[in-house]
């Protein structure tokens, strides 16, 4: 089965073609980061307009790269949510129009299921069941992934997502947008032990998380040093290191509890923050002690991309799922509302 996938939930336009026998045949991605950076964050209206301009040229590019004609496709997959409503409508509208014109089935894909399944694109793919940590700018979830489409939430952030906290901490330090990668890079130059930030909600049972307190602690630390303008480069590096260490420790502690609670010996981490090298190293170290194998997507599949949507769509189309004819999106869409796919175990 060969599927065209379209991702447009936020500020990346991603297109890919995935074949269940040959793997990924082609992909293209356009990031709007530079456009949104001047505003310090994503502007939904600008994101939607840019998707309109980019998506069809990217589809043509990928079809050429994959040496694929419309008649060789078996379906079209698109991100239906969660995400920005206008951005989702662009991808959904184009996908449904192409599917109708090419007489192909279409399938709606949950954005976070796409992330969750991205590590399965790798040669050494994990089998169900496993614990999954989905950690990005919009979501931070710990899941018991029992089968394709059967997910139980073990814990989640009760306030800000981890990636959002990284971005806001970066903004407080004057590092610009997007802040997560900049904080991680700067943290490598930080002095260990100069500052120690709290590890929120790790002193109580349960798997829920909180990251808003880290933002407050960051702001208070900056103010204690005389404000953002008074910070030296070493101050910024030391704050970045303390912030990253606290966020990483919090996530690792919760993952450790999750594998102990479920008894699973496989852990998947996906989403934009899964590219953080400190988080990967600390998680691998802790899971190795417990005999748990850890799986990540390749770096290019950590952030939003079309490959994960094409892949997830292919699995759902194989199981007989089809999108209804009216174009429907779900800007808010709990992952637990996905139906388990019959025969997908």
From Swiss-Prot:
The organism of origin for this protein: Alcanivorax borkumensis (strain ATCC 700651 / DSM 11573 / NCIMB 13689 / SK2)
A Pfam family that the UniProt record links to this protein: TsaD
The enzyme's E.C. designation: 2.3.1.234
Superkingdom of origin organism: Bacteria
GO CC annotation: cytoplasm
Gene: tsaD
GO molecular-function terms, A-Z: iron ion binding; N(6)-L-threonylcarbamoyladenine synthase activity
Cofactor(s) needed by this chain: Fe(2+)
Described purpose of this protein according to its UniProt entry: Required for the formation of a threonylcarbamoyl group on adenosine at position 37 (t(6)A37) in tRNAs that read codons beginning with adenine. Is involved in the transfer of the threonylcarbamoyl moiety of threonylcarbamoyl-AMP (TC-AMP) to the N6 group of A37, together with TsaE and TsaB. TsaD likely plays a direct catalytic role in this reaction.
Keywords for the protein's UniProt record, in alphabetical order: Acyltransferase, Cytoplasm, Iron, Metal-binding, Transferase, tRNA processing
Cysteine disulfide partners in this protein: none
InterPro entries linked to this entry: ATPase_NBD (IPR043129), Gcp-like_dom (IPR000905), KAE1/TsaD (IPR017861), Peptidase_M22_CS (IPR017860), TsaD (IPR022450)
Localization annotation: Cytoplasm
Positions of substrate binding: 134-138, 167, 180, 276
Reactions mediated catalytically: L-threonylcarbamoyladenylate + adenosine(37) in tRNA = N(6)-L-threonylcarbamoyladenosine(37) in tRNA + AMP + H(+)
Family the entry assigns: Belongs to the KAE1 / TsaD family.
Protein name as catalogued: tRNA N6-adenosine threonylcarbamoyltransferase
PROSITE patterns the record matches: GLYCOPROTEASE
SUPFAM superfamilies for the chain: Actin-like ATPase domain
Cofactor binding notes: Binds 1 Fe(2+) ion per subunit.
Residues reported in the UniProt entry to bind Fe cation: 111, 115, 304
